[in-house]
């Protein structure tokens, strides 16, 4: 049985106020967010450790996203918890020395992902695998700047998904990072911050302005 839907504890002004500690927001999210939501936003684990790596903007975004998506604790079936959750918990148990061998911690991810259609939860791409995707990219105002999904039946027959090696910089970083968390058949909505999209320069040829937050609907149809 689903838990009662929590009420918003703070206004936007209170959330951004320095008087509200990050730990309070993290505790609220851990108390009320589902495991998969917390894993997606890297909010699992000891509150003190999470507070060290998560900045205030990321926590405010996660707080608002929790109420937008309604992914509260008890709202998802236990089986919905992905391998990503297990991996996060395993990584927390690793000794700290191993971190020196990895790339420096860059803080929270610069994207959020909402699952629109579940995948098989078995086949996940690895770095260097070729992935095949259908996608539509829009700006925040809803303007479509790119898509490979055809509407006319004639064009549909000739349409092919986008294929590329994932995790090696062939596409924007938001795509590279997000697709590694998706399983075959999954469709997701990605909201990518400018830092992991086209940054300060934008992409004038594609009519993407500077510092643009991009929204994609991506379906991972196959992995080679």
From Swiss-Prot:
Classification via SUPFAM superfamilies: FKBP-like
Q: Which residues form the PPIase FKBP-type domain?
A: 128-224
Q: What is its EC number?
A: 5.2.1.8
GO CC annotations? Answer: nucleus
Positions where Phosphoserine occurs in the chain: 36, 152
Q: What spans are recorded as compositionally biased (Basic and acidic residues)?
A: 89-102
Which stretches does the entry tag as region Disordered? 87-119
Q: Anything known on activity regulation?
A: Inhibited preferentially by rapamycin over FK506.
In UniProt terms, what function does this protein have? FK506- and rapamycin-binding proteins (FKBPs) constitute a family of receptors for the two immunosuppressants which inhibit T-cell proliferation by arresting two distinct cytoplasmic signal transmission pathways. PPIases accelerate the folding of proteins.
What is this protein's name?
Peptidyl-prolyl cis-trans isomerase FKBP3
Task: Identify the species of origin.
Answer: Oryctolagus cuniculus (Rabbit)
The gene it comes from is FKBP3
